[in-house]
C-alpha cells in the first residue's frame, strides 16, 4: 500500500518509522530530513501548498496519507487530498479548528456543556480587555486565537508579572495579529500539573494512548522561555506518577464528548486528537487541543505501539477503529537543540550524530529541524533531534536516553533533568500540595 506522510520534523520521522516496514512509504517535506529521506521516496516542497501536495499524491498513486503538522491542516490539506481520492489520517479543515481557532474550541465546550472547561472570554478589541482585567481578581493566561507554533501563550506568574503585564502582552497580540487573528482569549490560570493524552479517532470511536508529560521550558528546573517541548516521558502503566486511573479516565471522557460535539458542529473528526490537560484539585481541566500528534509526545507513544500502525490508519479512515495495543514499558524523550535556543540559536552549523552508537544503547534518534547537505547535517534555528529510549522503569529509560544524548556532538544542548527521579518527585510533591490545600 502506498502511504504518504506529510511533514518534516521528528514527529513525522517517528510516524514514518512506525509505518516503514508495512507500506511503500512516500514523504512530502520542506527540508531534507535525513531520517525520513533514508526510508521513503520523498519530495522537498512547501507543505502548506496543499494543491501541490495533492498533485504529488495523485501522480504517485498514494492510497492513504498521514498529516503531521498543524499548519497544513489549517490550510485544508485533508480536503485537497480527499478531492483527489486520497483518504487521510487527519481532520478536515473545518474540524481542525479545534486547534487552529482556540475560540472555536472554548465555545464548543460551552455550547455542548463539556466537562473540564475553564473561565474564559474571547476579545476582539483592547478596550474590553482593559476593563475586564481591571475587574478580574485572578491570574490569567493570555492566548492568541490562531496558531503560533506553541510559543504564543503567556501566563501570569510565569512569563508575565501580573494582570497589568498581561494587558501589555494582549495589546501586542492585537497589534501584530499574532496567530493570524486580531483576537485574544483570556483564561483563568489553573494551578496543577500538565499532562497529555493523545488518541486515534475515526469520527465516532476514540482509542486513547498512554499519558505523557512534556517539558516546555527551555532550561533545566523549568526555567526559561516556553518552547515546542524539550522532552517528555511515559510510564509503564500508561499513567504518570501523579496521575490516577480515575483522572486519566475523566480526561478521556472529555475527549470523547469533544469528538461527539465536533461531529455535530462540523464534520466527523478522523485523525489524532491531542488533549493537553491540567490536573487541578478539581480534576482534569482542558488547556487546549491539537489536531495532530504532539511533538515530542509522538516519539514516546509510537515506539510502544504493538498493533501495526498501518492497521490503525486504515481503521481510522474506514470508521472501523476498535483498539490499539501498547507495550508495558516506560519511555523518555530528550530533545537536542542548538546552543542559544530559543532566543539566538546557532543555525547553520554541523551536528554529528553517532546513530550506530545510539542504536547499540537501545535508543532511537528522530531528526527534527535539520537539513542534510553534502557536507553533513546542518542545524536550523529550532529543535534538532529527539532521542527516545524505552525501559522497564522511567529511571532505566532516562539513563539510556541520557547516555545516547552524549553521542551527539556539536554546539547543542539538552535538558538533562527530563525523566529524572528528582524532577518526577518534584511533580508528585507539587500535585500533593495542591490536593492537600
Predicted regions and their residues:
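Internal nucleotide-binding/catalytic subdomain
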Residues: 154-293
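Short arginine-rich
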Residues: 177-179, 403-418
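Active-site nucleotide/adenylate-binding loops and adjacent lid/helix of ATP-dependent enzymes
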Residues: 4-5, 99-183, 237-257
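A cross-kingdom feature marking charged/low-complexity
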Residues: 418-437
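Active-site "cap" helix and flanking loop/linker of ATP-utilizing ligase/carboxylase catalytic domains
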Residues: 251-274, 290-360, 372-373
